[in-house]
Regions:
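A contiguous pocket-lining binding segment that forms or flanks enzyme active sites
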Residues: 115-117, 125-138
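Short, charge-patterned binding micro-sites
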Residues: 38-68
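Conserved small/polar residues in nucleotide/adenosyl-binding loops
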Residues: 149-156
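Long, contiguous binding/interaction regions
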Residues: 137-147
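Short, extreme N-terminal leader segments that mark the start of a protein/domain
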Residues: 1-28, 32-35
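Short, intrinsically disordered, mixed-charge
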Residues: 22-36, 82-90, 129-132
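Ordered, amphipathic secondary-structure segments that act as subunit-interaction surfaces
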Residues: 62-113
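Short glycine-/aliphatic-rich beta-strand segments at the starts of folded cytosolic domains
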Residues: 6-8, 110-115
Length: 160
């Protein structure tokens, strides 16, 4: 039994699939594909899967990964990719299937590209220029106004 990493991209309407729904999608796709995946032992067996660094709802991705254990000794990774892409929902495409080289918790960082409106740099500069950013904090004792200015990072916008 080996662990296989399935790398996929999530675009357009698929970006609104939450992590729990994505788990259900992957389970259904793997079941329908007929690929030899390993199931947990127990009263209600399910496919063993691990998602590495899942994204928040509404974010598109070019590289998301799910690790799956397989019962096959030497799986044909090209056949896995073809079988999965044939039944994937619109907006999700598997672009690589390979044996696991490093565990999901070994990922140290991720690179994000975020697109903002044209006036975002100006609004961010205005925000950074503020001396204080009052925030209402609710507690058992009531509502009080605090400033977390000393905790915020200095944000910048860069043109790429």
């Amino acid at each position: 039994m080996i662990t296989v990493r399935i790398s996929f991209e999530k675009k357009n309407e698929a970006s609104y699939i939450s992590l729990l729904d994505m788990q259900r999608v992957m389970q259904r796709v793997l079941k329908r594909s007929g690929l030899p995946v390993w199931h947990t032992l127990g009263f209600n067996p399910h496919i063993y899967m691990t998602f590495a660094c899942p994204l928040s709802l509404g974010q598109e991705s070019q590289c998301e990964c799910v690790d799956v254990k397989t019962e096959a000794e030497n799986p044909d990774f090209a056949q896995w990719q073809t079988a999965l892409n044939a039944i994937m929902p619109a907006g999700i495409e598997v672009y690589r299937v390979e044996p696991l080289k490093m565990k999901a918790d070994a990922i140290a960082y991720a690179c994000y590209r975020i697109r903002y409106p044209a006036d975002a740099a100006e609004k961010l500069a205005q925000y950074n220029a503020l001396d204080s950013v009052p925030v209402e904090k609710k507690s058992k004792r009531g509502v009080r106004t605090v400033s977390y200015t000393h905790l915020r990072a200095h944000e910048t916008c860069a043109d790429l």
